[in-house]
């Protein structure tokens, strides 16, 4: 959260916002507390590109792109389970994903990000961060169908970058 606060306080960011400068994209990390970038993209009239360095599908990224994230065949990476999950493992995976996404992330983390945005953009009315997140045009993920999640359906705007080596 402190990194977002420092970024939104930075002189160059403030200048770009005041000048009404337009950008093509704003890249936002998929992990927690980077969601302030969604509102920054709206202010800069830019497309949102979500990137993830995790090797697993993240439920809120899948939700943002409108693609399925089914914990019955996509085990939660924080849990110990096999790819051939039992009913108990599937249930635990489902409950864990729900608590992480809706309890921790959507309620707690996004609440803190909203307070941060209120600090930097006082008095401005804005859509919810979840609504802004649904405007993401692309997701770049350091994942690969052969590791972690395995094969699962993804949209064309979800790009697996895993196992690519840039030299």
Task: Put a short name on every predicted segment.
Residues 1-167:
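Nucleotide-sugar-dependent glycosyltransferase catalytic domains
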């Amino acid at each position: 959260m402190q990194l977002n606060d420092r970024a939104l306080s930075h002189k160059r960011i403030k200048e770009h916002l005041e000048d009404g400068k337009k950008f093509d994209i704003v890249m936002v990390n998929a992990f927690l507390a980077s969601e302030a970038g969604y509102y920054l993209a709206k202010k800069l009239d830019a497309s949102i590109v979500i990137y993830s360095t995790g090797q697993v599908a993240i439920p809120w990224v899948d939700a943002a792109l409108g693609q399925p994230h089914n914990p019955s065949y996509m085990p939660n990476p924080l849990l110990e389970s096999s790819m051939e999950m039992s009913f108990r493992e599937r249930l635990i995976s489902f409950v864990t994903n729900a608590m992480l996404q809706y309890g921790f992330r959507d309620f707690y983390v996004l609440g803190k990000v909203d307070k941060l945005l209120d600090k930097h953009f006082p008095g401005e009315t804005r859509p919810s961060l979840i609504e802004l997140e649904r405007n993401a045009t692309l997701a770049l993920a350091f994942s690969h169908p052969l590791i972690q999640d395995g094969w699962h359906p993804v949209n064309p705007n979800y790009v697996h970058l895993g196992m690519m080596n840039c030299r």
